[in-house]
Design a protein with these regions (language model features):
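Cysteine-nucleophile amide-bond enzymes
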Residues: 1-178
Length: 178
């Protein structure tokens, strides 16, 4: 599904993203709090970074941070996210259904401070405007509808936020213009 997600979620400088997490400090060690199948969990930073690679075999990860004037939101966002540990992953990508997909967890964590905005979701090929076959099969297997046009959020939308600054590149995500 990562390729299908990346195709429909363009982000920072045209980069295609399929996942997002929140870096947290746990026992003096940087880790990543994320919603990934099967649940919301804390992952070792090394494992998170080395999950996906660019064509040069560098981790396909960029680091974004809230701009300084929004950093007062971080403590509450981390607490909120930790309160969701072990809640099941949201396979259908719907907001407000008591499960979480990666971007939804980040959105909800910062909701009280209105850091990120929901946008209409799409599962359509950007050129043909046809629903991608992989999404038809995926939602058919889940025995539910494709939430085309429903409000949602994705890693690309978050990376485009004017409240974020991109501060580091481990590698170059597909689609990214230098």
């Amino acid at each position: 599904l990562c390729d299908a997600i990346e195709l429909v979620t363009p982000g920072y400088n045209g980069a295609n993203f399929s996942h997002i997490g929140l870096v947290v400090l746990e026992n003096d060690t940087l880790k990543v709090l994320e919603a990934i199948p099967p649940k919301v969990m804390i992952t070792n930073l090394y494992d998170f970074i080395n999950r996906s690679f660019d064509k040069n075999r560098n981790p396909k990860v960029i680091v974004g941070r809230l701009k300084k004037k929004f950093t007062n939101s971080i403590s509450n966002a981390v607490s909120y996210s930790k309160s969701k540990l072990d809640i099941p992953y949201d396979e259908v990508f719907l907001i407000n259904n008591e499960t979480y997909y990666c971007s939804e967890l980040i959105y909800e964590a910062f909701l009280n401070d209105s850091i990120f905005e929901l946008k209409p979701m799409t599962f359509l090929h950007p050129k043909t405007k046809d629903t991608l076959k992989v999404w038809k099969e995926y939602y058919s297997d889940l025995n539910t509808y494709i939430p085309e046009g429903n409000s949602g959020i994705n890693p690309g939308i978050i990376s485009l936020s004017n409240k974020i600054e991109i501060v580091h590149f481990y590698g170059i995500p597909s689609g990214m213009e230098k």
